[in-house]
Amino acid sequence: RHKLKADFLEYYRRQLRKPDQKWDFVYHHFYNFVHGKCTFEEIDIDLCNKFREYLLNAKQLRRDGHISKNSASGYWSTFRGLLKILYRNRLIKTNINDFLDKIETEDTPKDYLSVEELYKLAETPCKKPILKTAALFSCLTSLRISDILSLQWHEIIDFAAGGKCVHTITQKTKTEDIIPISDEALQLIGYSPEKTGLVFKGLKRSWTQQPMKEWIREAGITKNITFHSYRRTYATLQGAAGTDIRTIQSNMAHKSITTTQRYMKVVDSNKREASNRISLIRK
């Protein structure tokens, strides 16, 4: 009974997984939703369903405008993950997840860089040189920003099939992954076996906002490119070049091939373009 009267928000705050930004966002949205007060006893199906509706209409925490449906889906999934922990630890009596519906995601057009745009980006100076190196490294390896920020020199090791690979614990999934990297990627970062510490020392996540947007604009690229677009660029260009989807899945450390297929949907449009390049009519 004492547990049920305890402060749920205090427990939630202690559970925040650094540097998992999504957990932090969900905590603040839930804090706003309950106006800063909530006990374990109040966590029931009705409250959770109301929080689901709140997320579908919630405003962004740091910017103007509402969160997207896909963001709401991700936040809701994270919150349901917490409910699972609560039930497993006997902090709530009912497995509430059994009574909650998912928030379905929407297919939305995702921008990526074409080969020509990647060349342009590589040729364009950036006011934050380490940001440019990190962005191009992501295009060549598919590493997420969270993994790039934490990447250490000692995690670059010999690959069994030859060359080098990144042997690391992926920040998002907390799984051990081995990701091969090309000689060009090694040259880009100035690899040397004697180096120690962070590979991208001094890089700040905040630079992926305004500083990166300025650099992309100066390269003459008008697409809405985020740092995650570089990972999508890797998948799309590998697919367009004929790399087997299972290989791409492995290199991107995707648990499910369905995830890889979502990244590569755009490749079908590349195939369509190719079909139109041969014609019997003079142009």
What do the PLM-derived regions correspond to, one by one?
Residues 66-69, 73, 88, 92-145, ...:
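Basic, Lys/Arg- and aromatic-enriched nucleic-acid-binding interface segment
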Residues 136, 140, 147, 231-255, ...:
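C-terminal catalytic core of tyrosine-transesterase DNA break-rejoin enzymes
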Residues 2-63, 82-84, 88:
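Basic/aromatic-enriched alpha-helical hairpins
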Residues 43, 205-206, 222-241:
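Short basic/aromatic active-site micro-motif
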Residues 182-222:
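Active-site/catalytic core of tyrosine-dependent DNA strand-transfer enzymes
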Residues 112, 170-174, 252-277:
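Catalytic-site neighborhood detector that most strongly recognizes the C-terminal catalytic loop/helix
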Residues 101, 111, 115, 141, ...:
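Conserved tyrosine-mediated DNA breakage-rejoining catalytic core shared by Y-recombinases
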Residues 155-162, 222-223, 243-262, 273:
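Short, polar N-cap/turn motifs at the start of nucleic acid-interacting alpha helices
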